[in-house]
Amino acid sequence: LLPAEQAVEFRGLSMGEKEVRMERAWRETDPSPETGENEVRLEFLKRVEIANARYTIFGPGMLSDRGRVYIRYGEPDETKVERLPVADKTLGYALGDQIPKSSRDALTKTETGAPDFRPYEIWTYNLRGREIGKHYGMSEINSGMKFVFVDDHGYGEYTLRYSSTSGMH
């Protein structure tokens, strides 16, 4: 949730320094400090719980690519999920003109030229998403954000392969 330069700095801190920094960050994000609850922190914890319930495969769901996007932006407005894509349900077909051709080709071209039948999810945020982490608070997100996750090996572990927004790779 931190900007890249702050994330690098944060990783270098001791455990005690990390705790102090996190507590200060939560105080700074509190939209209503006069109440006993920090609504941003509660929303963050709720999203972590949902990410762990939905996306845990080989490790905690909150650390997976889908979990990280979910925690940061919330529930997508639209999701297209294909667990067993066939014929006109392949990733290349589903993406159509939704992303730049060069990105689409990089995602869907196979070494053999055969159709790409990997399972995938496409998440689109139009209006509903609320980003946590933008300067330690919550903000409305840009409309039309798109994320493409692909299960490269068929084990249910989806990797973020395309993002229309900077900061999520």
Where are the language model's segments positioned?
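Residues within mature, well-folded domains
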Residues: L1-H169
